[in-house]
């Protein structure tokens, strides 16, 4: 199964490691990449690149991310994200627009989501 890697997982994996052991999510991402199952969507790409201040690091990350195929985002994904948002709110669950768009794209395209963001566990109780 192809895997949509969320910004939170990428951020942990891309963080410079000094003395601490490498986080498990980094090994998961490496395995997903090795297997050719990693996909990305524009909003995740934007979030990752928006956090880079140094122009050289920005360019390096942009070039690395270009290796991963973009999963298209359809009009129906935005509509489903809005539906999921409304369902979540009715259950007292708040979600960001990007998170719920990730859920919608994953549902339509039958993608797994790799994330360290615990909010996705709450979304899963609704969708």
Regions found by a protein language model. Give the residues of each.
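Short, well-structured N-terminal submotif of metal-dependent ribonuclease cores
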Residues: 1-40, 50-63
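Structured helix-beta-strand junction loops
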Residues: 34-36, 64-68, 91, 109, ...
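Active-site neighborhoods of divalent-metal-dependent phosphate/nucleic-acid chemistry enzymes
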Residues: 68-116
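A generic structural signal for short hydrophobic patches within well-formed alpha-helices
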Residues: 10-11, 45-48, 120-121
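Acidic, PIN/NYN-like endoribonuclease modules and their adjacent C-terminal/linker elements
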Residues: 1, 30, 103, 107-127
């Amino acid at each position: 199964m192809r895997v949509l890697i969320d910004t939170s997982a990428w951020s942990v994996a891309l963080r410079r490691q000094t003395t601490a052991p490498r986080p498990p999510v980094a090994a998961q991402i490496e395995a997903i990449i090795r297997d050719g199952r990693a996909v990305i969507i524009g909003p995740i790409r934007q979030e990752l690149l928006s956090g880079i201040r140094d122009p050289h690091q920005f360019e390096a990350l942009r070039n690395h991310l270009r290796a991963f195929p973009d999963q298209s985002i359809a009009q129906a994904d935005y509509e489903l994200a809005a539906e999921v948002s409304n369902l979540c709110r009715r259950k007292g669950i708040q979600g960001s627009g990007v998170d719920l768009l990730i859920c919608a794209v994953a549902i339509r395209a039958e993608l797994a989501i790799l994330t360290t963001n615990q909010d996705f566990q709450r979304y899963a109780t609704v969708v």
